[in-house]
Amino acid sequence: MSKIQQSILPISSLFFAISFLAIGYGMILTYVGIYLKELDVSNITIGIINASFFLGAILSSILSQSIISKVGHIRSFAAFASIMVSSFLLHSIYYDQYLWGFLRFLSGFSFYGLLIILESWLNEKSDSADRGKILAIYTIIFYLSTAIGQLLLNINEKFTQSIFTIGSILVLISIIFISLTKIKEPILEPFEKFSIPKIYSVVPLAATSSLIGGFFVGGFFTMIPVYLMIEFNSVEVVSYFMLITLLGGLLSQWPIGLLSDKYGRRRLIAYCAQSTTFVSLFFLFFSFNTTMVYIFGFLLGLTIFSIYPLGVARANDVMDENKDILEISRTLLFTYGIGSFIAPLVIGFSISFNSNFLFIIFAILGIYLSFYSLSKKRIDDDDLSTFINIPVTSGTKLIDFDPRQEETT
């Protein structure tokens, strides 16, 4: 048995838990927009309801660690999973915009609490030699599982009302794997305050990339399904589009990482932003054909999921040894969450006038980020850190899991 196998086997139950959790999460996050659109809810209301999920996620990144520290990982996991399952099931019982906003808030808070628990366990059971490989496996599992969740949307119409129930069952299955896990509970350090203006002054390109990257990904999961329902009125189109785009995001991580190590983050951020702009313009003019939409979706996935990891890598490149890398990394994640929160609010309001405004906004942000990136100073090759693949969604503990943190201690 190889060393990496010896490292993975003890935490295989965590990977199974992550897989089922991500399938349920990905399915419900996309389906909420579809379901609300089928109920003929206004786009502005859909945007506000979806933004509530990310508001819960942001607050969870601040508050959940103290909860976990007090009651323990396994009890906290059961509690957060129970809250998440309850919120899913309540979605299917009754629609009220205020109730749904609160339920989405609870879902976001509990989901990110679950991620913090799982990632802290992974961090506890991995050493510095295998940390990068385990993080890569985590990334692959998260992308693929979230993609599988999109396929489950494309079930027989007779069972569409059961989507929330299916999502609940998947989350409950993850509890089984955690309950059978024999892993020492890591000690969680208390949440430390950070200043976004301070971080922006230190790593402006990284902060801007994190904000815009969060906007792209948040808009993708919450409002692109609404856009597709407006244009095609087909759950099947939404399902396949989301699947193909996520696969594009997964396949892009390693090539873009290698290219950024060779040519620098600044240039790759600009290229990804430019590509996002061009693909967004393609949607404006050639979105009448589903095959073309799927192709554009794959191309969009190649770029939007890489911007935040590139921003984090840029921060690691430019930071001095006396800077608090952990503080900066957590602030970038917080900034990413703010971008995800803003996206459904802005897009929901904009597409109330015309659905094409979604990709007009994407194109404008892509142009801005491209020029902003190229205006910044290039980092010498000798100062480049190693690019690390980061899942589209992660908790605050994944920052501790980043093997680049080891290099600064």
Language-model features: locations:
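Intrinsic disorder in cytosolic terminal tails and internal cytosolic loops
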Residues: 1-6, 186-193, 317, 376-409
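Structural signature of the two symmetry-related core transmembrane helices
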Residues: 75-89, 168, 267-282
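A late C-terminal transmembrane helix in Major Facilitator Superfamily
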Residues: 323-351
